[in-house]
Amino acid sequence: MQVILSPHNFGRYYLCGMETLIGTADVPIKAFADFSGKVASAFARNQAVYALSLMNEPHDSRGLWKQTAQAGLDAIRAADHERLVLAPGDEWSGAWSWRLYNDDFLLDDPAHHIMYEAHQYFDLDHSGFYKFDYTRNGASPDRGVELIHPFAIWLKQHNVRRILTEFGVPNDDPRWLELTQRLLVYLAREEIPWIYWAGGPWWGNYRLSAEPKKGIDAPIMSVLTSHR
């Protein structure tokens, strides 16, 4: 098993209990670069680490995310020239809005070993909370494909490596499974690898969990395992 190390700070740092945007006076970009370099150095020879992600779901960065990400990447490369680095886009890394918020998000990597990562959920507000049922969420069998498509177009335009590192659907309506089935066929055709959210026994009754219960697979597993 290998893991992705990803700081789940959303482009921010909690300073004295306050969420503070990276790139502001209190949390300068050089502080993020220092952190990134130290993480890279600490795990440089660890074979269990598949990749370093620069950040989980940065958002509302006031236009600072590209500069922040480049500084983090530069610091990683100073410590480790071989590790795969994942570069998430601004505004929650949404695939559906990638071209709107990340159209110029191309980083300079001297190692040429970077993948651009997106996330996508298929409910009405793309949050992954799935507050409404399938119909009220405006879902359809092709909604997954339609929302990923802008990201796929951008990838082709720039000929860069890519990965969908987070997506998930509720287990309580089989129509979500059909959406996922069509999405995974599309991702295979576009050569976009993927990671499903989420697994692990700590999720309990979480509707998106792929964890088995009492030895019985979650419904979504029948779809996911058919695309291994």
Name these PLM-found stretches.
Residues 194-198:
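His/Asp/Glu-enriched short active-site or ligand-binding loop at hydrolase and phosphoryl-transfer sites
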Residues 1-18:
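Aromatic-lined carbohydrate-binding surfaces of glycoside hydrolases
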Residues 20-25, 30-51, 55-192, 206-226:
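Extracellular glycoside hydrolase catalytic/binding regions
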Residues 10-11, 169, 201:
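Conserved beta-strand edge residues that scaffold enzyme active sites
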